[in-house]
Amino acid sequence: MNIILPGDKDYESRPSVQRKSLRINLNENIYGTFVEIGAGQEVARNFYRVGAASGTIAKSMSAYDKSFSDSIYGKEDNGRYVTQNRLDKMLDHEMDLLEKRISRDKNPDKFFFVYANTVATIDFAKKFKGHGWMGIKFQTNPNDEYSEIKLHLRFRQNEAKLQQESLGIMGVNLIYGAFYKHNEPLKLMKYLSDHLDDQSIEIDTINFSGPLFKGVDNRLISLELVRLGMTDAVIFDENGTNVLPAQVLYKKNILTLRGSYRPITKVNEEMFKKSLEAFLKEKKVKEENTIVVFEITLSNLRSTGDIDDSDY
C-alpha cells in the first residue's frame, strides 16, 4: 500500500529504463528482433541486462560491414546507409524472417515486433556529430496488421560513447511507448526523451502509421516536436507526411513564403505566383531544381492567443 502524506501533490511517474525493459521482457507475448547498425547494440543491451530476455528477443544483430549488410538488405542506389529507405528494408526483411521462422500455430498468442536503427555517430575529427534513423514495426494483437513508428535523429553530444548510450535509452523509450503508450501518440513522442539530457538528441522527423494510428495527424505530431523544443523546424508534404528537411532541401533553389495561411487567400495565391515568376528569372535558378516552402512560425500560430491545432 502506498503512503500518502499531507501536502503531497499528484505527479506523473515515469518508469526507469530498467523498469521499461523488464516490463517488456516479462510479457510472455511480446516477441521480436533487434537489428542495429552503426552504434553497437545499445538498445538490445538494455533488455539483456535486466534479465528475462530469452522469451522476448528472437534475435539481435548488427550487420556492420557494408558488403555483408548489402547481401542481407540489398544495395542502396545512392550508396548511403543511414537513410529511411535502409530502415524500411531492415524492418520489412526482419519481420518477414520472423513470420517465416516462428509458427503462428505453435505461438498463437505472440505479437511480433522488429526494432531497427541505422546510425552514424560522431566522426574521429569531431566535425560531424552524426545522425540516424530508428523505427519499430509492431502489433499489439496477433491478428492485427502491423503499425510503425519511424523517426530521424541528430546527435548533439561530442563523444561516441555518450551518443551510443543515449541511442540505447531512446530505443527503449520507443519500444516501450509503442506497446504501452500507442493510444496517446503525443505523450509517446514526449516520453522518447525520458532519462535523456535535453541537449543529447534532436528529433527532427517522426511519422506514425498503421491501424493503431489511424486517427493520428502527423502534421500535429510535427507541430508538437517544435512546441516541445525537440527541434527548431519541421517540414511536411502535401499528404501531411513529415519529411526530413535536409533530404528535401539539399542543393535546391528554395523560395520561402511566410504567413499564417488561415485561410489561404487570393492575396497569398497572387504573392506566390509573382514571387515564383521573379525567382525563376534569377540566372542560377532552374525551375526543375526549385522548391517552394510555405513557412508557418509558432509566432504566426500564436497571433490570436494559444495555438489552435485546427489552424495547423
What are these regions (language model features)?
Residues 2-312:
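Nucleotidyltransferase catalytic core that binds NTPs
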